[in-house]
């Protein structure tokens, strides 16, 4: 995701310094017109720094620093903005916003809906929140990354909550797509025809159309790998527990994802919920996409 996004920014004429943790990535990034580095200090002179990282801990390390490594808060100039596009907890977002504020810096949360292919095609949907002046400063960049930006408030944590709940709608839909496809297949019918029927009538949205067809085709090649999906589910359940809101459907999805990973499917997409559903039903399965 991050590489595709950085490439699009560079193609739009923005000078991009790409900080990576793995030196072997530098050749690829250089070929894309980026200025790659493994030293976070090289971005300290930037007006806006974008982070696209896997989890709370990774974003905290970059923003707050660790051990002898200076983070963005200590390194960026007052007035600079940290544009955090990772899917993280609301607690982490609030902590980071407060830390940047102490240094006179802005913090905008802008997680995205969309897979790596959508990132390449600039078809992401961005969910942004932060101080209005900071969001507007970031908008020219966001416009090059996605097809639409939804501003959901001034508290960065609100963007992360919206993103997590959106992912839970997708995750529970994947579970039901997997279960219904397993039944259709076990009864000797074509799940693809079922998905076409449903998406042509009552369920015409992107999730049912795109992921439904992938589950029907038993296509589990990773776009959003199961461990990252499980991370988001756990974050969502943490938010639910904090608010005393039961989310039993999401709890089921968490357990199914854990089952998939325990069966050796950690490298597969979260569409592999369909594979687990088929196996649980003793329905015919194709393992061509499994390790």
For each predicted feature, which ranges?
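Hydrophobic beta-strand scaffold residues
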Residues: 16, 36, 106-108, 149, ...
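NAD(P)+-binding Rossmann beta1-loop-alpha1 motif at the extreme N-terminus of oxidoreductases
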Residues: 1-52, 80, 116
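Hydrophobic residues within alpha-helices
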Residues: 5-9, 96, 141, 183
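Helical "substrate-binding/catalytic lid" subdomain
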Residues: 156-280
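Rossmann-fold dinucleotide-binding core
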Residues: 63, 87-168
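Rossmann-fold NAD(P) dinucleotide-binding segment
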Residues: 40-106
